[in-house]
């Protein structure tokens, strides 16, 4: 198997995959949470209640879930292309950035509004620190160990 070198295009594809999967997680979290709140209304729909108001309430969360699934598919396509261009030892640790992005999104997006905690913040710091240790430095061409 040919030796894979660090490629800017591969890094960009991997980072795009991370961004898309983070957007997918946040979209689906909001969409499914909102649909869950509408569950009793959805049951009434099956019993012949007013369709138009329920449809207007459920449209945005259903679209958010659909957009999340679409982002998952795009993320997978980017990931497959990134794996063709990057060594797995470089590509795979980049996936941990999605934990960072999803946590920050869950905390700072007002419609998710999850609590900020120092324990989780420490975990995020450790993930980022781990990436610094694992990813090669600019002047490092190959791992001699």
Curated annotation (Swiss-Prot):
Q: Which ranges form a coiled coil?
A: none
Q: Which family does it belong to?
A: Belongs to the ArnF family.
Where in or outside the cell?
Cell inner membrane
Q: What is its main location?
A: membrane
Keywords assigned by UniProt, alphabetized: Cell inner membrane, Cell membrane, Lipid A biosynthesis, Lipid biosynthesis, Lipid metabolism, Lipopolysaccharide biosynthesis, Membrane, Transmembrane, Transmembrane helix, Transport
Q: One cellular component GO annotation, for this chain's record?
A: plasma membrane
Recorded hits in PANTHER family, A to Z, give:
4-AMINO-4-DEOXY-L-ARABINOSE-PHOSPHOUNDECAPRENOL FLIPPASE SUBUNIT ARNF-RELATED, SMR FAMILY PROTON-DEPENDENT DRUG EFFLUX TRANSPORTER SUGE
In its UniProt entry, the species of origin is given as: Shewanella sediminis (strain HAW-EB3)
- GO: which molecular function terms? carbohydrate derivative transmembrane transporter activity
Note the subunit structure. Heterodimer of ArnE and ArnF.
Q: Report what the protein is called.
A: Probable 4-amino-4-deoxy-L-arabinose-phosphoundecaprenol flippase subunit ArnF
- Transmembrane annotation, as ranges: 4-24, 62-82, 90-110, 115-135
Q: Which GO terms describe its biological process?
A: lipid A biosynthetic process; lipopolysaccharide biosynthetic process
Q: Which gene encodes it?
A: arnF
Q: What does this protein do?
A: Translocates 4-amino-4-deoxy-L-arabinose-phosphoundecaprenol (alpha-L-Ara4N-phosphoundecaprenol) from the cytoplasmic to the periplasmic side of the inner membrane.
Those parts of the protein on the Cytoplasmic side are 1-3, 83-89, 136-145
Q: Which InterPro entries match?
A: Flippase_ArnF, Small_drug/metabolite_transptr
Q: Periplasmic topology: which positions?
A: 25-61, 111-114
Q: What is the membrane topology noted in the UniProt record heading this document?
A: Multi-pass membrane protein
Pathway(s) per entry: Bacterial outer membrane biogenesis; lipopolysaccharide biosynthesis
């Amino acid at each position: 198997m040919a030796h894979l070198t660090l490629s800017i295009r591969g890094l960009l594809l991997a980072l795009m995959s991370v961004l898309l999967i983070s957007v997918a997680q946040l979209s689906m979290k909001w969409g499914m949470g909102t649909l869950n709140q509408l569950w009793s209304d959805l049951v009434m729909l099956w019993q012949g209640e007013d369709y138009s108001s329920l449809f207007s309430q459920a449209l945005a969360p259903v679209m958010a879930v659909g957009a999340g699934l679409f982002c998952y598919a795009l993320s997978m396509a980017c990931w497959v292309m990134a794996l063709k261009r990057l060594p797995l030892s470089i590509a795979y640790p980049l996936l941990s950035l999605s934990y960072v992005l999803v946590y920050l999104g869950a905390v700072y997006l007002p419609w998710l509004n999850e609590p900020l905690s120092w324990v989780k913040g420490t975990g995020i710091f450790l993930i980022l620190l781990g990436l610094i240790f694992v990813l090669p430095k600019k002047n490092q061409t190959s791992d001699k160990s």
